[in-house]
């Protein structure tokens, strides 16, 4: 098996790898909107909860960028993705931007990717609005 990480503090704190290739399948752990150890477009938080979903699009874009970086380390691209699961704090906010962001990320008007959108009440960091896991085939 081949593995890759982003080398961010929460990998060792939680104890996992960002991506793992087994055979011809690449499994990408839930990706967040970060650039190194810094969160990108963090949502405002009050009492441990996001108070606005206005950064959904920016966070979603960075999440696809992070997935693409991992795939590149295996010699793959987002074109190799066969399935994604999108976890969000607010389904209407995500649905409003997901089509546009996904089409741009995959570079086509009809991404050939099985996709599931799931609403959840929390993610790894309270500032996060979206997390996406991927499966790719090479």
Where are these regions (language model features)?
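N-terminal presequence-like segments and the immediate start of the first folded domain
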Residues: 1-65, 69-82, 88-138
């Amino acid at each position: 098996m081949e593995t890759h990480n982003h080398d961010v503090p929460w990998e060792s704190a939680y104890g996992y790898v960002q991506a793992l290739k087994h055979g011809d399948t690449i499994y990408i752990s839930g990706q967040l909107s970060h650039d190194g150890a810094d969160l990108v477009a963090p949502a405002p938080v009050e009492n441990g909860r996001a108070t606005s979903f206005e950064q959904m699009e920016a966070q979603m874009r960075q999440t696809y960028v992070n997935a693409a970086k991992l795939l590149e380390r295996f010699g793959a691209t987002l074109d190799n993705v066969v399935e994604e699961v999108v976890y969000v704090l607010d389904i209407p906010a995500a649905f409003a931007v997901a089509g546009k962001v996904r089409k741009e990320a995959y570079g086509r008007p009809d991404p050939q990717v099985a996709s599931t959108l799931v609403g959840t009440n929390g993610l790894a960091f309270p500032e996060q609005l979206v997390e996406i896991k991927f499966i790719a085939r090479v």
